[in-house]
């Protein structure tokens, strides 16, 4: 197996598959139907907030990853376990799933990731291996070849996308009159899933993806017509670490191309403003989790006066010092 084998397939999720995923996830107590605060006052605007920040493990990631395990071979899971690559929410979710299921979990993370994240994942029983960022994909591919582990990709897998689509179905259940659905985008798994659910359900809502200016692989992909890496070999520059993979997923991009109306970008300062506005509205969010709200508050969505706008709040996992900086007016050092 090579690193190129880790990319997702070209197939698109169907409505039946999305509904099947939602039904399957309802059988797991740890996959929560998260609250949606409709027409909530945030930063002087009325915004409907889909609080994936209240999902088990603190982010939306558990939806897709739980469904990936549901669809995987049980004997392989028992004998070999799972593997992922992540320094953040995906690694946290896979570590949790290893603990919850008893399957062996291994997480490869960039050598630059903070040690406390490694310790946190290890506390849940995961084996965590730090490698240089440019060698992550090769390390995971070698691990799969040698240990036969099931790959739980952080975003680029159609089963992951189908699982995340359950979030989109819930959004429509709670706001069938939504005019605009706004979703943060890193590799694109959540955006792909929510957009597929919204469009396949027949909703006329406009779906908008939001990326940091310093990590806009999906916007570059939309412009070029194929999944792209960030410039200079995948370099990113943003405080929104959860939205800064070096590349857009191929399976994710195929769904974005089919179901997303527009991808916009926001600055780090705009995400900090949104994080503060959410805090004042009673919602704790990591900076990445505030990106969709940032697009709304910064006027990146066009004329939405009088329209029902639903924004995902994708996660709450943030270090204390990062949160203090986000809530302050002081410039944040990169």
Where are these regions (language model features)?
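PLP-dependent amino-acid enzyme catalytic core
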Residues: 1-334
């Amino acid at each position: 197996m090579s690193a190129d084998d880790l990319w997702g397939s070209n197939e698109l999720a169907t409505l039946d598959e999305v509904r099947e995923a939602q039904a399957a996830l309802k059988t797991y107590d740890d996959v929560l139907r998260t609250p949606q605060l409709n027409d909530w006052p945030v930063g002087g605007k009325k915004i409907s907030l889909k609080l994936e920040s209240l999902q088990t493990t603190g982010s939306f990631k558990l939806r897709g990853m739980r469904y990936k395990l549901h669809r995987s071979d049980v004997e392989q899971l028992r004998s070999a376990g799972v593997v992922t690559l992540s320094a953040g929410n995906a690694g946290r979710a896979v570590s949790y799933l290893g603990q919850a299921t008893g399957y062996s979990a291994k997480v490869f993370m960039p050598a630059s990731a903070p040690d406390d994240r490694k310790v946190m994942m290890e506390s849940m029983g995961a084996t965590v291996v730090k490698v240089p960022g440019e060698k992550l994909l090769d390390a995971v591919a070698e691990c799969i070849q040698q240990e036969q582990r099931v790959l739980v990709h952080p975003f680029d897998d159609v089963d992951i996308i189908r699982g995340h689509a359950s979030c989109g179905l819930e959004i429509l259940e709670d706001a069938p009159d939504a005019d605009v659905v706004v979703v943060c985008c890193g590799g694109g798994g959540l955006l792909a899933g929510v957009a597929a659910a919204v469009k396949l359900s027949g909703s006329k809502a406009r779906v908008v993806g939001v990326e940091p200016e310093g990590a806009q692989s999906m916007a570059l992909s939309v412009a070029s017509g194929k999944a792209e890496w960030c410039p200079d070999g995948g370099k990113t520059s943003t405080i929104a670490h959860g939205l800064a993979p070096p590349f857009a997923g191929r399976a994710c991009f195929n769904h974005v191309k089919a179901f997303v109306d527009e991808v916009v970008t926001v600055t780090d300062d705009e995400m900090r403003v949104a994080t503060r506005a959410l805090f004042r509205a009673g919602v704790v969010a990591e900076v990445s989790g505030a990106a969709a709200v940032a697009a709304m508050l910064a006027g990146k969505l066009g004329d939405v006066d009088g329209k029902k706008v639903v924004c995902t709040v994708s996660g709450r996992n943030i270090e204390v010092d990062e949160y203090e900086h986000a809530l302050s007016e002081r410039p944040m050092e990169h």
